[in-house]
């Protein structure tokens, strides 16, 4: 996938060149970790926890019993801490959560699992991913992203590793932190799903050749 800050025919180094999407995930890391923790502590879905965080930041979610959201009211201890954290991130760091960025949560869970159990594997936030055939690349585009390109060459500085990206597609609106964690374990362990979408993670140099 060619990002807005990338050009065909230019050689990039994954260690030095980070896509805007990955930069934003890194910027929001602490905030998204707080959302994950709230889901883990309460058992509510990650989407519900994220939406609650959005409402806290935009001022429609309050702590008072008569005005507070039912999520906060049902979990007074964890909810109060979560409320305070979201307000602090918003006020001090000028962070706002947006609905279209909810998928960033999945990347945070994936990276957390990698750091805890699979440190020897390449980070999705500090490597590039590509597909070894056009079929998988086009299947990826069906999930909302286009602008697919063929990679002319990849010069890895470590061994390339294959993973099944279809594990991400198993996440539902009702999935909580623990459930998504199990999906991430399936991904990092190298297990394949019936409808596998094989991607390769690699750190090193890469160059885009042409648009498909």
Language model: regions and residue ranges:
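Short linear interaction motifs
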Residues: 102-125
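Conserved NAD+-utilizing ADP-ribose enzyme module
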Residues: 2-103, 124-126, 135-148, 155-212
């Amino acid at each position: 996938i060619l990002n807005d800050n990338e050009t065909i025919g230019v050689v990039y180094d994954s260690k030095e060149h980070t896509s805007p999407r990955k930069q934003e995930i890194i910027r929001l890391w602490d905030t998204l970790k707080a959302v994950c923790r709230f889901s883990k502590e309460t058992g509510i879905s990650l989407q519900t926890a994220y939406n609650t965080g959005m409402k806290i930041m935009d001022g429609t979610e309050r702590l008072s019993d008569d005005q507070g959201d039912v999520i906060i009211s049902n979990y007074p201890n964890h909810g109060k801490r979560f409320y305070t954290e979201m307000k602090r991130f918003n006020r001090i760091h000028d962070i706002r959560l947006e609905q279209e960025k909810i998928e960033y949560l999945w990347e945070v869970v994936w990276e957390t699992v990698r750091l805890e159990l699979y440190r020897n594997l390449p980070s999705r936030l500090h490597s590039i991913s590509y597909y070894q055939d056009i079929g998988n690349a086009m299947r990826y585009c069906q999930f909302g992203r286009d602008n697919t390109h063929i990679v002319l060459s990849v010069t890895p500085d470590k061994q390339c590793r294959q993973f099944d990206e279809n594990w991400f597609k198993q996440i539902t609106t009702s999935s909580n932190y623990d459930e998504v964690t199990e999906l991430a374990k399936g991904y990092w362990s190298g297990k394949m799903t019936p409808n596998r979408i094989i991607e390769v993670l690699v750190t090193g140099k890469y160059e885009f050749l042409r648009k498909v």
